[in-house]
């Protein structure tokens, strides 16, 4: 008896946009992180809204009030679902993430390789924590893999950060 895995080839994001009104002022380092995260996310991801059937999907991310908004649509623009998630579980993680990112960007200009590596390990650890939190918050709503969660967390951080 064989168990077949679901075909996830169409369960993916093909386009992602960020609500421009939600984006805080940011420097070139943050803009670079955002561009890389969007590119990497569209290139490879697993994104399967529960009960929506096969994709592909587009995703618009924004902040409305104190909530994170995931506006999910089909590739042709037809609405699928909008999820609103509380930002509370992300506030401390995003704050810590940007504090360590600031240290990292300063360190790569002046610090020793060992110090840069130590800061980068801390940065990755906080990023992983945010990614796991996002997976937990989306559980039962949208199935995503860890790498997709990492890229989405980067984008959430850009929205959440108010410089």
UniProtKB/Swiss-Prot annotation:
Domain of life: Bacteria
Pfam families: UPF0262
Transmembrane annotation, as ranges: none
Xref: InterPro entries: UCP032146 (IPR008321)
Protein family (similarity comment): Belongs to the UPF0262 family.
Name of the featured protein: UPF0262 protein RPD_4278
Source species of the chain: Rhodopseudomonas palustris (strain BisB5)
């Amino acid at each position: 008896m064989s168990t077949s895995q679901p075909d996830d080839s169409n369960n993916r994001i093909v386009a992602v946009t960020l609500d421009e009104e939600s984006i805080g002022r940011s420097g070139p380092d943050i803009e670079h992180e955002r561009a890389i995260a969007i590119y990497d996310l569209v290139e490879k991801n697993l994104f399967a809204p529960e009960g929506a059937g096969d994709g592909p999907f587009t995703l618009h991310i924004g902040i409305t009030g104190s909530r994170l908004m995931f506006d999910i649509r089909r590739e042709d623009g037809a609405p699928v679902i909008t999820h609103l998630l509380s930002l509370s579980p992300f506030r401390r993680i995003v704050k810590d993430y940007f504090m360590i990112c600031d240290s990292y960007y300063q360190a790569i200009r002046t610090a020793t390789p060992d110090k840069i590596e130590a800061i980068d390990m801390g940065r990755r650890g906080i990023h992983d924590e945010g990614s796991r939190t996002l997976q937990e918050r989306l559980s039962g709503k949208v199935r995503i893999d860890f790498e997709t969660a990492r890229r989405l967390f980067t984008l959430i951080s850009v929205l959440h950060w108010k410089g």
